[in-house]
Design a protein with these regions (language model features):
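A ligand-binding cleft/hinge motif common to bilobed small-molecule-binding domains
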Residues: 97, 114-122, 169-172, 193-194, ...
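Flexible hinge/capping segments at coil-to-helix
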Residues: 39, 140-157
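Periplasmic-binding protein-like
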Residues: 132-139, 208, 212-251, 270-276
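C-terminal motif of bacterial Sec signal peptides marking the signal peptidase cleavage site
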Residues: 18-22
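Short loop->beta-strand "edge-of-pocket" segments that line small-molecule binding or catalytic clefts
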Residues: 44-50, 150-163
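Extended ligand-binding regions for polar small-molecule ligands
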Residues: 24, 74-83, 164, 231-273
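Extracytoplasmic small-molecule ligand-binding "clamshell" domains
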Residues: 29-113
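Short helices/loops that flank or line small-molecule/ion binding pockets
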Residues: 79-83, 91-92, 96-109, 123-125, ...
């Protein structure tokens, strides 16, 4: 009997020990996951990743004699940082590397006029939309009526930004194989000027700025690409720790929309882009 009692005692001790270890491990996991909003507050900064070649959303400008990343998306990000009570730090990189930066914990959020399409929502969390825009085509002057339908895009060499919604539209929706995908809009504009591509599919606001900055180009007279809307939402690393941060971001977005600040930020960005 004493032997049985001893074995039972050892079994109970082992069970308690394993239970405590499991609780300890679970607590550690929860601590590692933590709350993203609190982590940002503790760090004192909100790190934004963007691709600053997409004026008026994000671009380089001389501000007080210093090269600075500015634009519509940056204004939205600043409003979010202000609400949290931290400084905004901006990282500039290629558009197709933005979600990778989130997953590698190099950035807290991405604002880059990024549409939360079906593929992206598998790999990132998103806020509510803060802006929506139509797509247009940029062509060489004198060719404004050359492209009349989406089908016409399949018969020409089209330029799109790599990793963009427009690339998905051209490749997946139209099934086009005759296209050029580059990481930066200015590079696409030069390709168009030099005759290496026939058109660029991009957002209406981006097109309006770029046709002013480059010679011999214009916006096409058609509704090509209008079924592929461009919209902006804040992207975050896919995680269970984002709930409070997403809630705060959505609160900021609604407040900016209700107060007319979203349109104000866009007009300010367009004006600043025109001055560069």
């Amino acid at each position: 009997m004493k032997g049985i009692k001893k074995l039972l005692g050892l079994g109970l001790a082992l069970t308690l020990s394993l239970g405590m270890a499991a609780c300890s491990s679970s607590g550690k996991d929860n601590e590692e996951v933590g709350d993203k909003l609190q982590q940002i507050k503790d760090s004192g900064k909100l790190v934004l990743a963007t691709s600053a070649d997409y004026s008026p959303y994000e671009f380089h400008a001389m501000v007080d004699g210093k090269d600075t990343i500015v634009g519509f998306d940056v204004s939205i990000a600043n409003a979010i940082a202000d609400e949290i009570g931290v400084e905004l730090e901006v990282m500039d990189m290629d558009f197709d590397g933005l979600l990778g930066a989130l997953n590698a914990d190099k950035a807290d959020i991405v604002l880059a006029c990024m549409t939360p399409d079906e593929e992206r929502v598998k790999n990132a969390d998103f806020s509510e939309l803060y802006y929506e825009d139509k797509n247009v085509v940029i062509v060489r002057k004198g060719e404004e009526d050359k492209i009349k339908s989406d089908e016409d895009l399949k018969n020409i060499n089209v330029g799109v930004q790599r990793g963009s919604t427009q690339e998905g539209f051209v490749v997946d929706t139209l099934g086009s194989t005759n296209y050029k995908s580059l990481t930066k809009i200015p590079d696409l504009m030069l390709e168009l000027q030099n005759g290496n591509i026939d058109a660029i599919v991009t957002g209406k606001n981006v097109a309006a700025i770029n046709v002013q900055n480059y010679d011999n180009v214009a916006i096409g007279n058609s509704n090509v690409g209008e079924n592929c809307e461009e919209s902006g939402a804040v992207a975050l690393k896919k995680s269970d720790s984002n709930d409070s941060l997403v809630e705060l971001i959505n609160k900021v977005i609604k407040k900016l929309q209700d107060e007319g600040k979203v349109d104000e930020y866009m007009q300010e960005a367009i004006k600043l882009a025109d001055e560069q």
